């Protein structure tokens, strides 16, 4: 049997919102497999569908830059939020974003070797900034997207670059509408553009979880299947952008809103600073002690 560490319990709590003892029991029952533990909690009705997005860890900025038919979204990390608000750091982020577009680098490693017009490499420029700012800085990731003259980019930054979205709308040049959709994606955080992108494996997995959940609720077997399909449709609506109620007008879906502009959402990239990165341990030991009193 796997050892259930406090760190593992904490991670499960962050992903599900379930209580500490429920999380510990779920991990014990599933031999420490966190994904199975999430399903266990959901089947027992203890936790809602986990988005499986890890706690925000590192600081830094997300930035979106567009040039004609090309656009890039980039995340650059710093150690503290104080530095992320530094004007010099913000300028560095813009420089790097423009360098990605100018060089069409495909990986972070390749980008670091590219040179600016002054002959200085990106790697050298970042080391120079580290020396000036006094913190470790790093280019974490970026994504380039393209469009044609009949399409539009939607660029949106939330909380000064804490969250950034780059959306691609096909068939419409209405940049304001595309930006509104990018804002929706920043707020609601869908996983996919549409249900067509959801794998059969994920759908079948969700269907099985919902079935067990319904049976555990004591629902009669003859209505379970109908109930599961209804809940599955709701689940897909929650994770697919085009099917969601548009944040600026909940009376219509994102798809319907864009249709009034002659457009269609075909792609998006959403970055949130530090997502998926390890967060410092904070007060969890104190919380455990409190539970023992």
From Swiss-Prot:
Family: Belongs to the EF-Ts family.
UniProt xrefs under NCBIfam families: tsf (TIGR00116)
Keyword terms: Cytoplasm, Elongation factor, Protein biosynthesis
Recorded superkingdom: Bacteria
GO molecular function, one term: translation elongation factor activity
InterPro entries: EF-Ts_dimer_sf, Transl_elong_EFTs/EF1B, Transl_elong_EFTs/EF1B_dimer, Transl_elong_Ts_CS, UBA-like_sf
Name listed for the protein in its UniProt record: Elongation factor Ts
CDD domains: UBA_EF-Ts
GO cellular component: cytoplasm
Role this protein plays: Associates with the EF-Tu.GDP complex and induces the exchange of GDP to GTP. It remains bound to the aminoacyl-tRNA.EF-Tu.GTP complex up to the GTP hydrolysis stage on the ribosome.
Organism: Staphylococcus aureus (strain bovine RF122 / ET3-1)
Principal subcellular localization: cytoplasm
Record region (Involved in Mg(2+) ion dislocation from EF-Tu): 80-83
Cell compartment(s), UniProt: Cytoplasm
């Amino acid at each position: 049997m796997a050892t259930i560490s406090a760190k593992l319990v904490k991670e499960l709590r962050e992903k599900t919102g379930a209580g500490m003892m429920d999380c510990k029991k779920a991990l014990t029952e599933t031999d420490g497999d966190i994904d199975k533990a999430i399903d266990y909690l959901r089947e027992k009705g203890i936790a809602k569908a986990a988005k499986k997005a890890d706690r925000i860890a590192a600081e830094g900025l997300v930035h979106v830059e567009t040039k004609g038919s090309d656009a890039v979204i980039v995340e650059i990390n710093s150690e503290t939020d104080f530095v992320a608000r530094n004007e010099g750091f913000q300028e560095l982020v813009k420089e790097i974003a423009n360098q990605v577009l100018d060089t069409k680098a495909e990986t972070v490693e390749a980008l670091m070797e590219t040179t600016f017009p002054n002959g200085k490499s990106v790697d050298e420029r970042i080391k120079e900034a580290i020396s000036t700012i006094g913190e470790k800085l790093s280019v974490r990731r970026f994504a380039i997207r393209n469009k044609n003259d009949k399409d539009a980019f939607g660029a949106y930054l939330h909380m000064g670059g804490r969250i950034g979205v780059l959306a691609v709308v096909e068939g419409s040049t209405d940049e304001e509408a595309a930006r509104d959709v990018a804002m929706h994606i920043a707020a609601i955080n869908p996983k996919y553009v549409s249900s067509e992108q959801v794998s059969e494996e994920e759908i079948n997995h969700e269907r099985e979880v919902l079935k067990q959940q319904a049976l555990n609720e004591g629902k009669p077997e003859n209505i379970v299947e109908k109930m599961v399909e209804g809940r599955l449709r709701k689940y897909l609506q929650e994770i697919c952008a085009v099917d969601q109620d548009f944040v600026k007008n909940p009376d219509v879906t994102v798809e319907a809103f864009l249709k009034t502009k002659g457009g269609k959402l075909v792609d998006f990239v959403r970055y949130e600073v530090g997502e998926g990165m390890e967060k410092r341990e904070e007060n969890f030991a104190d919380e455990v002690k409190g539970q023992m009193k």
